[in-house]
Amino acid sequence: MERVLLSALGGQRTSSQTPRPPMDLADLDARALYLQVNAIERSTSKNYATGARDYINFCILHSLPLDPTPTTLSRYVAFSSQFIASAPKYLTGVRHFLKDLYPEFDDNRSHPLVKSTIRGSKKVRADPVHRKLPLRLAHLQSFVDVAECTGSFDDLLMAVLLSCAFYGCHRMGELIQKNDQSLSDWRKIIKRASVCFENTRIQYRLPYHKSDPFYRGTDVIFTMQDVANPVALLRKYVSWRDRLHGAKSALFLREDGSNPSRSWFDLKFFAILDRRYGGHSPRTGYATFLASLGVSESIIQAVGRWSSDAWKIYIRENPAIRVEQQLAAIRLQH
């Protein structure tokens, strides 16, 4: 049958490329498994594993079969929600690892018994949502002032990171590395070679972000600003960095040559600001800043590289942005 079909399609020719030799089926299966494992980020897989382990431990503790029936899932949520607010989210990890073993998982997860237990757990816990405050221009200037006062390379790096995070609307995870080195991915690191200088602007290539899962890359462009000017700061930093680290590939490096980590960032960040602010504050701050200028939501969404659904959730749950937009609209009317 296969040869008949090939003949009807014009023979075995597939392209002008060199013919591809067959692979051993075991090697193909191993390759397929490798690709499946890499379908999600390692950090996501680690979080999923946490949820799956929690569910398995629950079943062992209560002498229940692993089969995720509606009753078992309901019991799991009822038990876990006493201790953690993320119990319903853990079911995503359970699904990831057990779906192949139990194909009916989605139907059971959507069962009215499970849905009502999840809804009840959220209402009973009623955990408040704590949003980090947006960073303001005065905060950025504070970090620049520290760098100018100390003359420290690492303090300059910190000021540069925050300026880039703010004006580039970055997630901090795009500029700094996780503390867990096993989760670091060289492909995501911004490279020194991608930096391009022009008269009044500078740009680099962001190789990956959440809305770009296939590493197509995005050019992040900075223009001159009155406060914590990213163009001037990056020029100064890159000149100093090149003298220290020469041809090392990563753009953002500490004085000792290591990548800036989350713990390093937190130490510097919270030396000046309190816990009402966080790593997401620069991104929130720039969105708020743009809104205060009357920039439309669609432009803010594009600048921040948000997916549509994520942006709708983001702007709805950050009233500061709505306030700034309303004030900007009033100013434009007058």
Regions found by a protein language model. Give the residues of each.
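Extended, non-catalytic subsegments within catalytic or DNA/protein-binding/adaptor domains
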Residues: 1-334
